Amino acid sequence: MQISHSIDTFARHIQTDIMIEKQLIPHISPRFLNEEKYRRGHIRIINALPERKILGLHLPEIKQVAKQLAKQTDVLDILHAFEQEHQAERFRLTYEETLVRGLIINALKCPWEERLSLLKPYIPVLDNWAVCDSFCCNAKWALKVPANELWQFLQPYFKSKREFEVRFALVMSMCYLLKEAWLDIVFHQLEELDLSTIHSEYTNLTSPYYVRMGMAWLLATALAKYPDETRSFVKASSLTEDVKRLYARKARESFRTRQVVPY
C-alpha cells in the first residue's frame, strides 16, 4: 500500500530535517489540485493564517497517516522531530503536518499521564480552528482521564492570552466534561474568561472570534444535553451579548437543538 511505504520512508529519515510533506502530497484531493473554485473553498473553510501552507488533503487521509506513524517503534523520535521543526520556524510545517502531529499524540498507546506530557509542547502550536477542533474531537483517550485531572490540566489554557489555547480548553471541556457533575463548574469558567485580554492573530474578525465561537459551541452542545440548566445559566449569566447571539445561532444551526428554545 502506497501510504504505508511513504510512512516507512519518513520513519527511516526521521533524524534529518525531512518531515512528511513529500509523503502527504500523493494523497492530496484531485479536486483541490484541479478545481480552482473547490481549492479556494477548501482554503477558505480552514482559514489558516496566511503563512501556513495548505496541501489540500481531507481529514480521513490525514488520520490514516497519523495512525500508521503512531505504530512506528520510533514514534517518540517522530514526535520529537515535529517539535524541533515547529520550534525552528513557526510556519515551516504545513497545516496537514501540524495536524498529523496532534493526531499521532491521540493515536499513541500510552498512559494518560504520558500523553498529557507529550501534549504540552503541542498546544502552543495551535493557531487554527481546524487543527484545534480536529485534535480535540478525536482525543477519545480523554474519556479515560479522571475528570478532575483533565480539568486541572486545562486550567492554564483557560487563563492563556492566546486565542487557540483558550479554544483548546473550551473544546476539550465541551467534548469530555459536559457531564451533570461538572456542568456548573464549566459554566462558571465561561464567565471567568476575560475576552479583552485574549490576543488573536485574525485581525479581520471580532477579536477573539474563535474563542467566542468556542464558547457558543460549548453552550449549544450543553443545550442539547441539559436544556433547562443551560437556559437558566445563559439568562442569568454575565456573558457578552455577542456570545449569547452566537450561541443562539449555533443552536438554530444544529439539528439537535434547532427546535429547542435557547433562552
Please report, for each region that a protein language model flagged, where it lies by residue.
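Alpha-helical scaffold domains
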Residues: I3-Y263
